[in-house]
Swiss-Prot record:
Gene3D superfamilies: Dihydropteroate synthase-like, Sulfite Reductase Hemoprotein, domain 1. Converts 2C-methyl-D-erythritol 2,4-cyclodiphosphate (ME-2,4cPP) into 1-hydroxy-2-methyl-2-(E)-butenyl 4-diphosphate. Its cofactor is [4Fe-4S] cluster. It is an enzyme of class 1 (oxidoreductase). This is 4-hydroxy-3-methylbut-2-en-1-yl diphosphate synthase (flavodoxin). The lineage of its organism: Bacteria, Pseudomonadati, Pseudomonadota, Gammaproteobacteria, Alteromonadales. One of its GO terms (molecular function) is 4-hydroxy-3-methylbut-2-enyl-diphosphate synthase activity (flavodoxin). [4Fe-4S] cluster binds at C270, C273, C305, E312. Pathway: Isoprenoid biosynthesis; isopentenyl diphosphate biosynthesis via DXP pathway; isopentenyl diphosphate from 1-deoxy-D-xylulose 5-phosphate: step 5/6. Belongs to the IspG family. Disulfide bonds: none annotated. It catalyses: (2E)-4-hydroxy-3-methylbut-2-enyl diphosphate + oxidized [flavodoxin] + H2O + 2 H(+) = 2-C-methyl-D-erythritol 2,4-cyclic diphosphate + reduced [flavodoxin]. SUPFAM superfamilies: Dihydropteroate synthetase-like, Nitrite and sulphite reductase 4Fe-4S domain-like. Binds 1 [4Fe-4S] cluster.
């Protein structure tokens, strides 16, 4: 129930991606990217809706061809979540999706072309009030920078980003955010640190091509956790070779662990040992599965014995401490007379957790209306 984070966010300007504020103290937005063929309109819409269901604030869609741009038009009309069009190589695609109501344009300095092409995109974005993301990637730096630095370095990623920041500055266009992604944690972290000292625009965080679900989640948590703990970052994407829905879940889990932004239940559970009075692992797994739909931020501790159980329960909204045959139940730190039969823990806990989630949601609603 410790709700306040000690982290002080880096000051930044604010932009809007659709109706989602980015920067200047706004909640850190969690986004993902579709991995369907964009021309498969039905599959892409279905995936976007699945992402929206688990809390995605923004969804990025690759638009590699003009056919994909035409598909994007239909997709945009069919979903509610703001969409970012991911544009590489052909700047004319950016102009086309701008006509179709895109909420943000992501361009890659390494392949979008010369300043004249960038100018065309910027003028279009200005006319239609569309923000831009300058998306630098260690795997696609400009050739002259690779010749200069020999390999991706923090200085190379920074120089690539600043070239295009300078172009936008000269054009008096300030509605943009920047990313300097790399697949190496230290390269990405140092690149973002350097960039954060140079500009005031919002920063989009990511460890690019992080890997599969397990390793990629760990790598992203380490890298983004370092930056977020320093107050750096205004929006993020977890890049996993996995179902994009998992990217959203991991993104919120990282923010939740730093108490920056919470969505859903924070389960505090012991790894279990021979002292456990019930099967902790199966209990937690089943509760996580059943309660995925709960969006209210709350802490639930599931501890298998009395060594740490009472202490964790004191700082949880709902706490369970393992006991012989029956386990102790806590509500907001207070031990209750009611005890739960260890053979029926999941059903009993689910009911209590859902009731507490509703109570907390109502409490927040009342607070909002009285302030």
């Amino acid at each position: 129930m410790y709700n306040e984070t000690p982290i002080k966010r880096r000051p930044s300007t604010r932009i809007y991606v659709g109706n989602v504020p980015i920067g200047d103290g706004a909640p850190i937005a969690v986004q993902s990217m579709t991995n369907t063929k964009t021309t498969d309109v039905e599959a892409t819409i279905a995936q976007i809706r699945a992402l929206e269901k688990v809390g995605a604030d923004i969804v990025r869609v690759s638009v590699p061809t003009m056919d994909a741009a035409e598909a994007f038009k239909i997709i945009k009309q069919s979903v509610n979540v703001p969409l970012v069009a991911d544009i590489h190589f052909d700047y004319r695609i950016a102009l086309k999706v701008a006509e179709y109501g895109v909420d943000c344009l992501r361009i890659n300095p390494g392949n979008i072309g010369n300043e004249e092409r960038i100018r065309s995109v910027v003028e279009c974005a200005r006319d239609k009030n569309i923000p831009i993301r300058i998306g630098v990637n260690g795997g696609s730096l400009e050739k002259d920078l690779m010749d200069k630095y020999k390999e991706p370095t923090p200085e190379a990623l920074l120089e690539s980003a600043m070239r295009h920041v300078d172009i936008l500055d000269r054009m008096n266009f300030d509605q943009f955010k920047v990313s300097v992604k790399a697949s190496d944690v230290f390269l990405a972290v140092e690149s973002y640190r350097l960039l954060a000292k140079q500009i005031r625009q919002p920063l989009h965080l990511g460890i690019t091509e992080a890997g599969g679900a397990r390793a990629g989640s760990v790598k992203s948590a380490v890298g983004l956790g370092m930056l977020l703990a320093e107050g750096i970052g205004d929006t993020l994407r977890i890049s996993l070779a996995a179902d994009p829905v998992e990217e959203i879940k991991v993104g919120f889990d990282i923010l939740k662990s730093l108490r920056i932004r919470s969505r859903g239940i924070n389960f505090i559970a012991c790894p279990s040992c021979s002292r456990q009075e019930f099967d902790v692992i199966s209990t937690v797994n089943e509760l996580e599965r059943r309660l995925e739909d709960v969006t209210t931020a709350m802490d639930v501790s599931i501890i298998g014995c009395v060594v740490n159980g009472p202490g964790e329960a004191l700082v949880s909204h709902i706490g369970l401490t393992g006991g012989h045959n029956k386990s102790g139940y806590y509500d907001e730190g207070e031990r209750q007379k009611e005890r739960f039969d260890n053979d029926n823990l999941v059903d009993s806990l689910e009911a209590k957790i859902r009731a507490k989630a509703s109570q907390l949601a109502n409490r927040i609603q009342v607070k909002d209306t009285t302030e």
